[in-house]
Amino acid sequence: MNLIESINAAQLRTDIPDFRPGDTVRVHAKVVEGTRERIQIFEGVVIARKNSGINETYTVRKISNGVGVERIFPVHTPRVEKIEVIRHGKVRRAKLYYLRALTGKKARIAERRR
């Protein structure tokens, strides 16, 4: 292992649950406001996972007051306290960008049987 790989391996988190696109997750993100730090919960559907290793990110989409909101989180960031998987969705795509154009019942994702 070269120097860069060893530095990256030291920063990888091991407490990340197994989740895929289509899963509904609850992300507990640390938010700094002035001198205070608090936990903000962002719950939505994972619509994409990109890259690998230390650079891996995932996109979570939710509907807030009738408006679609998406946030991109790095998987291995210390700014995310924990990730809870609420339900596992059954999808046949790796990227669910088509959900942006769907509303109401059309945007629902069936639950995957375990």
Swiss-Prot record:
Alphabetized InterPro entries for the sequence: Ribosomal_bL19 (IPR001857), Ribosomal_bL19_CS (IPR018257), Ribosomal_bL19_sf (IPR038657), Translation_prot_SH3-like_sf (IPR008991)
Disulfide bond among keywords: no
UniProtKB keywords: Ribonucleoprotein, Ribosomal protein
Transmembrane regions listed in the UniProt entry: none
GO molecular function: structural constituent of ribosome
One GO term describing the cellular component: cytosolic large ribosomal subunit
Highest taxon listed in the record's lineage: Bacteria
Family: Belongs to the bacterial ribosomal protein bL19 family.
Purpose: This protein is located at the 30S-50S ribosomal subunit interface and may play a role in the structure and function of the aminoacyl-tRNA binding site.
Protein name, UniProt field: Large ribosomal subunit protein bL19
Organism this protein belongs to: Lactococcus lactis subsp. cremoris (strain MG1363)
Gene: rplS
